[in-house]
Amino acid sequence: MSPQPFWQIYQEHNESLKQPLVWHTGVDAGFFAEYSAMLNAMLYCIDRGYQFRLYSADANYGYADGWTDYFKPFCPEETAAWHHRYNIYGVASWRELHRRGTLRTMALWKSKLALRHIVGHARAWMQYGRHVRLSDSVKWMADGAFSLPGLSDQVTVNEAFVALDSVAWRFNA
């Protein structure tokens, strides 16, 4: 009997988790920037014990269905249209904007995005009936050792990205 591929182990593990995080991909960056951010979000979910879900219906790289236009599905897909406007990435903190000296010029922009995050979380509560994490919850997993399902050893962030790449990067036939 051959060992189970990591993508199957990942899917079983992800499906066993109850608390969801819905990641919005294809927002406004180049494909590989979006892809790297998605792998980071997947690692964040594994590290925190959240179920990774994907919203890509409006992906800037898709032509009909988003992610599944090119790749096999690897997690539950969300389709609610409100994700387009309200499930957006987190931005620099007020403290970080002040440190950079851009607080005055960025205050309106930051306030607008903060309002969208609040509305997005309210919409998620109405749809799911409980707290659901959205794209703005994800923090960059820059360093450390991580435990991936099905692997006995701790892995670095680069090793984790390679493993998660084998989950997500599976072309449709």
Predicted regions and their residues:
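Secretory-pathway glycan-assembly enzymes, especially type II membrane glycosyltransferases
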Residues: S2-A173
